[in-house]
Amino acid sequence: MAAVNGVGLSWPSKLTKNQTPKWGFSPSHRRCNPSSSSSATIRMTASVDEKKKTFTLEKSEEAFSKAKELMPGGVNSPVRAFKSVGGQPIIIDSVKGSRMRDIDGNEYIDYVGSWGPAIIGHADDEVLAALAETMKKGTSFGAPCLLENTLAEMVISAVPSIEMVRFVNSGTEACMGVLRLARAFTCRPKIIKFEGCYHGHADPFLVKAGSGVATLGLPDSPGVPKAATIDTLTAPYNDISAVESLFEEHKGEIAAVILEPVVGNAGFIPPKLEFLAAIRKITKENDALLIFDEVMTGFRLAYGGAQEYFGITPDLTTLGKIIGGGLPVGAYGGRRDIMEMVAPAGPMYQAGTLSGNPLAMTAGIHTLKRLQGQGTYEHLDKITAELTQGILDAGKKTGHAMCGGSIRGMFGFFFADGPIYNFSDAKKSDTEKFGRFYRGMLEEGVYFAPSQFEAGFTSLAHTPEDIQRTVAAAEKVLKQI
């Protein structure tokens, strides 16, 4: 029986009649063998202590200072500016396997993975070779190509809810399209989202959102008119009764419920065992659609995503990150009768200049092929559980209040007593302490997401040695702070 790993987190992975929900403070441990076909990784060239002696960010500081004169805040996505953790943002020069190298020559074990896409490891040789071949034919066609058919077939065969799929260029685009589609299909205006869940930066979703909005402590965003969010209803994650109340209050008006089946943009927050099944039941009873935002969890928790892992099939699904293998991509798909409303098959308009880009399709195809290999998810399962439990054990040993957990290649931890059920719980975390921990780990050659409110990721390229080094560094830093 698979279980979510971590202190305060333990329950079965499938929702079946014969299983009893488990929720407590006892850690659970995985029992599986690592894959023998992990990607090659760059080896550390110095010990942790040696690295710290030579650690400098002088070149990154100089480059970032110039960047702030050229781009708002010096970055093209807010969390990269390190505002929530403090210190100097690192400027990356190259990546390979489980490692990143900055322009100062510092090397890091990477647990961000480009925010999720790098599940087979950075700059995989097979993917790079395939991209080189595709590039010989051109970088953008603006017309149909066979690669779109291939990736579409792979996605449809993998994801339980998807009978037809539309490729776009980002997770935000996917969520924008699926929202419009849900409203068009149901002829209803309102949607329910959950506090702390992030579905991109489109206006209707910037209400009690997670990700960068949570990181910066913003309740919403200036420039979003009330008219854009008047039909967006919110509820606390894992709160079934709140959703029932919203449907009762807005009878016949709610088009869909959209959620992250595992929250990753308010930190790592898994669903209670009964939560997803209850939301599926409520939406069916009210003729509303259920949308899983699997931009983060798709192909990460299982080859068929969180919906395969938990055994709950939504009506519509959004994807991104992994299906582009590190190139810009997004997708939304679902039941055929719903998807046939999308233009040109139907009247709901959505388009994109670079949608179905041949390079993104190529990277996605070869990434998914690698994920079909034997032992893929067992490897992710094992190393991620060992990483998370190792960090939590180090926290306990050094006297810090910490909680967290993992599912397959996704994990997170909070500097707070657990369990964490929703965004309100997550906000009790000691973010100042997380910042000190983060900066200490960076000096030790470990790169986590620069925010307490972001999940972490492992890859097929991560090795037992990576995990051991990370846990040892964590214990050292936790003693110091």
UniProtKB/Swiss-Prot annotation:
Its cofactor is pyridoxal 5'-phosphate. Keywords: Chlorophyll biosynthesis, Chloroplast, Isomerase, Plastid, Porphyrin biosynthesis, Pyridoxal phosphate, Transit peptide. It is found in: Plastid, Chloroplast. Pathway: Porphyrin-containing compound metabolism; protoporphyrin-IX biosynthesis; 5-aminolevulinate from L-glutamyl-tRNA(Glu): step 2/2; Porphyrin-containing compound metabolism; chlorophyll biosynthesis. It catalyses: (S)-4-amino-5-oxopentanoate = 5-aminolevulinate. Its EC number is 5.4.3.8. Residues 18-40 are annotated as: Disordered. GO terms for biological process: chlorophyll biosynthetic process; protoporphyrinogen IX biosynthetic process. It holds the Pfam family Aminotran_3. It comes from the Eukaryota. GO terms for cellular component: chloroplast. GO terms for molecular function: glutamate-1-semialdehyde 2,1-aminomutase activity; pyridoxal phosphate binding; transaminase activity. PROSITE patterns: AA_TRANSFER_CLASS_3. The modification N6-(pyridoxal phosphate)lysine is found at K321. HAMAP family: HemL_aminotrans_3 (MF_00375). Belongs to the class-III pyridoxal-phosphate-dependent aminotransferase family. HemL subfamily. Homodimer. This is Glutamate-1-semialdehyde 2,1-aminomutase, chloroplastic.
